[in-house]
């Protein structure tokens, strides 16, 4: 939730032109799907949510190592020991800061009992996968037959609860289940990392220290409130928690007690509070009851691709006047103003997206993620697969290639206003400008063929 809820770029996310997604170095992508996020103008925020089985509170002890290997590992052990010594000094100072924000001494003692520096968390945080997967590969997994089948079972198993949630918050039960399916594979991968240890390690590390210290304070407030014991407060390495992966600040702002037991328990094997909290979160960000997230459309041959821009909104009737139709050839019903989205350029599937698309972006800003949630929810309602074709002969640009594309566009006079390897609105605008200047289809698609033209 831009929550992934509040800041999901904390997982280092960004979706290149809605085309490619960073490959996960953690959980199996088939089970838990969080793509790289699309950069935004001035936010480092997204959602909040996690994975894995809720069993291990502390990392398992290292296996014994042959004597010959012990000497080779000695420098690493010394580095870990040095890091932990500094970490413990940081914790001492942090506890003083935490107490000034209302965290009690008893909570601090319980939360930090036995907590040591976790080098594995920093390794994951530092990992920047060079290789990416295309949006069509991501969607193949997001709405795979097994995920649809398991989602249907989850809907049936929790139908009464989901119908009450839908009635109370006005958010489609299939949307809630689709988020659940992508975030933790319907609760199968909720995360087994110690949240306090992970957040403290990340806050101490300093790369995004202020953000993670804020999350750590929020996590301690959750413990202070009695919603969870620190030893069962588990989640992802980056601090996302529960069935639908809330980060601590988002939990404080949006989690709800839907069972009425006095706790907002998103960690329980019973997903009621987590699912209701997801609906509450989406409602808080303006979910429009009865409005689709988006609808697949067919564009006329004469379509002006410069109109496929998030800043350009028209009513479905106005789009129909321009020849835009549903895949069955009919005009789209009036669900409010909408934009046209081409996540893989003019040769891929096209979508008419409504306000609820932007609401889902509060969970994760990547186009692929939002389409994944939306399409999975449609499949859970009995809808069809995406009918449009994808340029499956293409491959996604690597991180290095994305930076090269930005560099070459900028040198050619089409500034991307930064070279970061993240294909966001400014880079897409530069791509469009270049395409228009060269007489190419101005669809904003950052492809390998475009890069080759720039070389």
Predicted features and spans:
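Proline-rich, low-complexity linker regions of envelope-associated factors in Gram-negative bacteria
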Residues: 21-85, 106, 385-389
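Acidic/histidine-rich, surface-exposed loop or edge segments in extracytoplasmic proteins
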Residues: 70-79, 91-94, 137-148
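A general alpha-helix detector
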Residues: 90-94, 161, 198, 277, ...
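Mature N-terminal segment immediately following signal peptide/propeptide cleavage
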Residues: 78-110, 114-117
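Catalytic glycan-binding domains that act on GlcNAc-containing polysaccharides
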Residues: 103-335, 348-351, 357-399, 421, ...
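Non-catalytic peripheral regions of nucleotide-handling enzymes
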Residues: 22-24, 405-408
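Sec-dependent N-terminal signal peptides
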Residues: 1-25
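Short acidic, glycine/serine/threonine-rich helix-capping segments at coil-helix boundaries
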Residues: 397-402, 410-454
